[in-house]
Swiss-Prot record:
PANTHER family: INTEGRAL MEMBRANE PROTEIN OF SOXR-REDUCING COMPLEX, NA(+)-TRANSLOCATING NADH-QUINONE REDUCTASE SUBUNIT E. The lineage of its organism: Bacteria, Pseudomonadati, Pseudomonadota, Gammaproteobacteria, Vibrionales. One of its GO terms (molecular function) is oxidoreductase activity, acting on NAD(P)H, quinone or similar compound as acceptor. This is Na(+)-translocating NADH-quinone reductase subunit E. The chain crosses the membrane at residues 11-31, 39-59, 77-97, 110-130, 140-160, 176-196.
Length: 198
């Protein structure tokens, strides 16, 4: 149990997808204007990561891993296309659920919801799972923790950006300029966790 708690804390704070690996920055910067929208996207990313990492773990271990289907069969060359296909299917299902049950959130996320399919944070989580050889339970914990970490980062940035609307930002830095600086300072803050050994 201790190992899983350690993995969860590490994936949220120490190995934060957005602020340590800088994955998913396109949606991270574009959607972080309002806390409510950022929280909705963060929940969507967390759900997709929590489901796609373990599902891709099963697909990898049962079909793609060298020797999974037979002693001399190696299908690892299909990793990328298979992982992206599984992620795309899960995002499509999530999109249909949001459209049916949460129309305001679906409309607020707009084009960024289908972009979760190609969000490198999602694919990065799946790739790290394969690279680190996580088992199924570790994949569930890692996927959930990575999603929560990404959501924490985007909601924090959105909160700061909402407060900056009322600040006197120099004209040359308004918009994405000050957002990049803010994200960089947040990343420095998360770097303080890098020395923590769990």
């Amino acid at each position: 149990m201790e190992h899983y708690i350690s993995l969860l804390v590490r994936s949220i704070f120490i190995e934060n997808m957005a602020l340590s690996f800088f994955l998913g920055m396109c949606t991270f910067l574009a959607v972080s204007k309002k806390v409510k929208t950022s929280f909705g996207l963060g929940i969507a990313v967390t759900v997709v990561l929590t489901i796609s990492v373990p599902v891709n773990n099963l697909v990898y271990n049962l079909l793609l891993k060298p020797g999974a289907l037979g002693e001399n069969i190696d299908l690892t060359f299909l990793n990328f296309i298979t992982f992206i296909g599984v992620i795309a299917a899960l995002v499509q299902i999530l999109e249909m659920i949001l459209d049916r049950f949460f129309p305001p959130l679906y409309n607020a996320l707009g084009i960024f919801l289908p972009l979760i399919t190609v969000n490198c944070a999602i694919f990065g989580g799946v790739s790290f799972m394969v690279q680190r050889d996580y088992n199924f339970a570790e994949s569930v914990v890692y996927g959930f923790g990575s999603g929560v970490g990404w959501m924490l980062a985007i909601v924090a940035l959105a909160g700061i950006r909402e407060k900056m609307k009322y600040s006197d930002v120099p004209p040359g830095l308004r918009g994405l300029g000050i957002t990049f600086i803010t994200a960089g300072l947040m990343a420095l803050g998360f770097m303080s966790f890098s020395g923590v050994q769990l």
